[in-house]
Amino acid sequence: MLSRLFRMHGLFVASHPWEVIVGTVTLTICMMSMNMFTGNNKICGWNYECPKFEEDVLSSDIIILTITRCIAILYIYFQFQNLRQLGSKYILGIAGLFTIFSSFVFSTVVIHFLDKELTGLNEALPFFLLLIDLSRASALAKFALSSNSQDEVRENIARGMAILGPTFTLDALVECLVIGVGTMSGVRQLEIMCCFGCMSVLANYFVFMTFFPACVSLVLELSRESREGRPIWQLSHFARVLEEEENKPNPVTQRVKMIMSLGLVLVHAHSRWIADPSPQNSTAEQAKVSLGLDEDVSKRIEPSVSLWQFYLSKMISMDIEQVITLSLAFLLAVKYIFFEQAETESTLSLKNPITSPVVTSKKAQDNCCRREPLLVRRNQKLSSVEEDPGANQERKVEVIKPLVVEAETTSRATFVLGASVASPPSALGTQEPGIELPIEPRPNEECLQILENAEKGAKFLSDAEIIQLVNAKHIPAYKLETLMETHERGVSIRRQLLSTKLAEPSSLQYLPYRDYNYSLVMGACCENVIGYMPIPVGVAGPLCLDGKEYQVPMATTEGCLVASTNRGCRAISLGGGASSRVLADGMTRGPVVRLPRACDSAEVKTWLETPEGFAVIKEAFDSTSRFARLQKLHVTMAGRNLYIRFQSRTGDAMGMNMISKGTEKALLKLQEFFPDMQILAVSGNYCTDKKPAAINWIEGRGKTVVCEAVIPAKVVREVLKTTTEAMVDVNINKNLVGSAMAGSIGGYNAHAANIVTAIYIACGQDAAQNVGSSNCITLMEASGPTNEDLYISCTMPSIEIGTVGGGTNLLPQQACLQMLGVQGACKDNPGENARQLARIVCGTVMAGELSLMAALAAGHLVRSHMVHNRSKINLQDLQGTCTKKAA
């Protein structure tokens, strides 16, 4: 219950940082204003002469007080150093400075508001600083800085408050009760300092629970700049910080604190309310006199300066001990800000929070040279799941993004370089806390019993025992994900199995697999998974198409492709944009059936081409889906074989599975009318899918799209760096005549497949369908009053594309679809998102055609690729497998 309340409080504070900060500052100013203008009008030293108590001030007391102040400042300095180890010393340092300053101001205002004097603040200041515990800020900041986005910052702050809030509250209560005992001592100085201490603890608690989380959330929100796909403030060594913070406080310690609190409450109650009140009254009278509240002792004087000048003079008047203290504070602040950057710049600086991948690779290789061989370490890993944590940390490979190990399973897919194959399972966080596994693998019979036990399962088995069961054929290797408690552990074990069978056991070292949502992959996208392949994603645009602008994501490893397409998009935009139309929409499936004789096949063909036969088949076909609607049948014969090409709309799905289901149902219905018909295959390559085919070029498949644009002569000259005449000439002789001479089918273009494939990979399409989807004819001609403008059109008859199903279910691919505004199914007009995506593909292809044809016409192609598309890595430094074998 308490954790839930603190979580709600943390979420509110992190979600409304401006409101909380402004509210805190406003409350502080209001309390100060009420004291200054509407509070007690008796101000000691300005308009009222307070009693002076003669006290002997020894030089030793001044020295002790100065030493105490210096110790307090050093304590704060070391607290900031520990806080800096979280990552950015600037972000957290500023937040910590805000916390200390606001705590001090709030304590001062509380003291003013309660009408207490400030004469004891000089002595109480060191104790105030010593009571500040920045480990609280450190713990909460760990939660915030382990986030991938601003929304996750809020969630993690709320989660941190739920875990740390009850502990903070209990600690503050115990501190107040313990320090409050000093207020009953009867010693004036001790009572004043203890009173300050209690107020400081309460002020710190208030600020840490409100001002600090709001400040951290606001600072991270304002630091929106990203680097390598992650927030600039996100640091790599926060990979397992949430797992560390999940450890609950020691329950024994918590019980002791609660018992202590109860005892102290009884002590306070007995001393203040139950004991004989007469001593209390005398003490109160003494306190009243000591604080200058007895009007018989005090007397009013005429102020010589204004009130603000009085306060200013008190602030700037300093003794020698105060000068020493401030000098030490200034020197430590300068050292902290300016002279401690070098030691943390490589890993903790905001400018470069993560080491370069190339440097990391070299460091990993160097470290490997100093350790035992990889195979030996792997064997050690298979025989033990509990190894030295230091050794585990030594074998880590630098990640691209921080890995957040969360207690709750989320559907977030983030890209993290996987640990090397030598990383033990304990480093993966796969074993639950409290489960102790044996060092040596147990017998197969015992392991099978544990695996089949509903209360235990695979989490009570080590990786070595799982591998042992796989090798003994008790567990199929392809079922590892379904049998393990997490999909990721199944992938990890499969990698371990595979690495022992490879010629180079460390081959999988840089193939990432960690922190990926495999639940979206299993049974939908891939089998026998050993990881995922990060591919760079660039953006071309804005593409001005049909009056709208699109930023087009392109996943590719070919240099110059995105840059070239981007130039084409710019030329189209400067020319007023492009226009597009979807001419046809229908996915196809072409099964093959066989009849006893060719004449029987001809009879079936004739029946299918009649309205009655088509209506029967359409009814059976349409009954299989609420989206699939049979449009037409294209039937042809080859001897006694009959090829039937079904064409149907499939909504926003690419539709191969949908139309296959309808085709199968229609064939069964057809078999009822012609019992001698034999169904050979639901796909007879008459579709045609993933193969060059004239039928797709002629009849179309998927979406048939045409796109056009007019590029002004000025844009052709200044952006494309060529002339309209040259581009038209090259297009005719290259794209038309050249492709015809090569016998191309649908390849009357410069490089449509480049753009299609890049968009397909980014948007979760079937990359193999670029074969048919890249069918395109690019036409160019001179236009305009002077025939100097360039008219260009691209016609693509077979774009096989969809926005639901398959790879579009993966979150990174969904992100790219969301960039284009076509993610998921269109509720208002089913199929519109897929058609719009096909238009974008065609428009982007036209942009790519423009730029490449201009480069060819101007003779810039080879030059640009020699400059921008050549790797700068020195291959002589990289020894391949063949080199090692030869050596």
From Swiss-Prot:
Q: What is this protein called?
A: 3-hydroxy-3-methylglutaryl-coenzyme A reductase
For the SSD domain, which residue ranges apply? 61-218
Please give the knockout or disruption phenotype noted for this protein: Homozygous knockout mice show early embryonic lethality.
Q: Which family does it belong to?
A: Belongs to the HMG-CoA reductase family.
Q: Does the keyword section mention Phosphoprotein?
A: yes
Compartments in which it is found: Endoplasmic reticulum membrane; Peroxisome membrane
- Source gene? Hmgcr
Cross-link Glycyl lysine isopeptide (Lys-Gly) (interchain with G-Cter in ubiquitin) per UniProt, renumbered positions: K89, K248
- Reaction(s) catalysed (UniProt annotation): (R)-mevalonate + 2 NADP(+) + CoA = (3S)-3-hydroxy-3-methylglutaryl-CoA + 2 NADPH + 2 H(+)
Pathway(s) annotated for this protein in UniProt: Metabolic intermediate biosynthesis; (R)-mevalonate biosynthesis; (R)-mevalonate from acetyl-CoA: step 3/3
Q: Which residues are glycosylated?
A: N281
Q: What is the lineage of its organism?
A: Eukaryota, Metazoa, Chordata, Craniata, Vertebrata
